[in-house]
Structures are given as C-alpha cells and as structure tokens.
Amino acid sequence: MSGLPIATNLYFDAHFHRHGVKLLPNEFYTTREDMVLVTVLGSCVAACLHDPIGRIGGMNHFMLPDDGADPSAAASESMRYGAYAMEVLINELIKAGGRRERFEAKVFGGAAVLAGMTTINIGDRNADFVRRYLALERIRITAEDLQGVHPRKVAFMPHTGQAMVKKLRVQAPDVAAREAALAREAVDPHGERAPRVRPRVELFGTPAPKAQAKPRIELFGMRAMQPATRKQEA
C-alpha cells in the first residue's frame, strides 16, 4: 500500500465532534474508526463504500473517468482516473475485512461548474462512469447526489455509512481553478475531445440486491440546498 495515495490530512472536525480526514483529488481512505471523511467536489466524483455488517468503509476522489493508461504508470497518477480509483478502494476494503457482496455505495459530484462547458462535460462523464462501474461490479447505489451546477462538500462516516452533503456557491475559487485545469487536460492538443474508454471491470453472476427505499444522506451547514436524489427500486 505504500505506493498508493492514501489521504494524510487528519484533523479534528468541530462540526461533527470527531476526528476526520480531508481527502484531496486523487486520494482515498478506508477505516473502521468512528470518524468523518470530508472532500470538496466540482466535476470530480467521490464514491463512498460501506460494509454495514463489517462496519468498515472508505471514500475516493477521482477527476476523470479513465484514460486507458499504461498499467506501469505511477499509482499517484493513476488515481486521477475512476477505473483505478474504484479498483483501489474496493480492494483495500476487502483487504481490511470487508465483503464485496455486502458493499453499499453512495456517490457524489459530477457537477458542471464551468460556464460554457458544452462540448466537454467532465461532470457528466464522471457521473455516467461511476454508475456504470458500480452496476457492472454488482455494488448497489443506495443514494446519490450527482450532476447539477453546484460544487459540493461531502462528509461520510465510514463506520456507520451515514453521508451528508452541502452545496457550495457555483464559483468557489479553488474549485473553479481546478475545473479549468481539468478542462484543458480533457482536450487533446488538436482541440478534439479525448476518447472515452470503458472501465476495466469484472462481471459477477450474483444479482445485485435492491437499493434501500430511503438514502441515508442528510444536509449539513447553513448553505445546504437540496437532498441527494433518491434511488428508485428496480
């Protein structure tokens, strides 16, 4: 695990009255501890996975769906991409004692936070990717808050699976700067859209369990705007 970009920004969260970890882009974190994992998202996506029986969970934060990268690429670079970030999170939870068949997912982000982003909507691509990846992996999404135009601050309690989300003002300076850099990266030198690559995932024969009727996602902070979208049962 030494080569993987595990989040290291530990702090005490005064709002939740517990220790926490702030995840930056390209990072992940897994734990059984009763703590809070926090990240801020624009077009990026965070997947929060939880084993309700093992009471273990984790979060990742990826910037682009997949680049079809060389497997020998550095782990810190590969974590930018959803396929690798999801694989790392799942595998690390299993190594720590989680059971894949019990995993539940809550997913956030994928906003279109830059005005005029009509030809390359990174947020839509990320949201579409994480839904397809989890469907192929037979991991149910119990709740989601994806797309739209607002950046988000997400808090996840990996011990209980509780998640909370806060919508931020559209042009949050740090998020806007990061989004501009992502937009440049998503376009090749000739100004054409980078090709989309299907995630390298495995299929499993066991049918996915149905999603819960109500997502365990709440709002926090004074500027919260709306709850996460409820997942409908098939």
Curated annotation (Swiss-Prot):
Enzyme class (EC, first level): hydrolase
Annotated GO biological process: chemotaxis
Hydrolase as UniProt keyword: yes
InterPro entries linked: CheD-like_sf, Chemorcpt_Glu_NH3ase_CheD, Cytotoxic_necrot_fac-like_cat
Any one GO molecular-function label of the UniProt entry: protein-glutamine glutaminase activity
Catalytic activity: L-glutaminyl-[protein] + H2O = L-glutamyl-[protein] + NH4(+)
EC number: 3.5.1.44
SUPFAM superfamilies: CNF1/YfiH-like putative cysteine hydrolases (SSF64438)
Signal peptide: none
Entry keywords, A to Z: Chemotaxis, Hydrolase
Pfam families: CheD
HAMAP family, sorted: CheD
NCBIfam families per UniProt: PRK13487.1 (NF010013), PRK13489.1 (NF010014)
PANTHER family according to UniProt: CHEMORECEPTOR GLUTAMINE DEAMIDASE CHED-RELATED
Family: Belongs to the CheD family.
Functional description taken from the UniProt entry: Probably deamidates glutamine residues to glutamate on methyl-accepting chemotaxis receptors (MCPs), playing an important role in chemotaxis.
Protein name, UniProt field: Probable chemoreceptor glutamine deamidase CheD
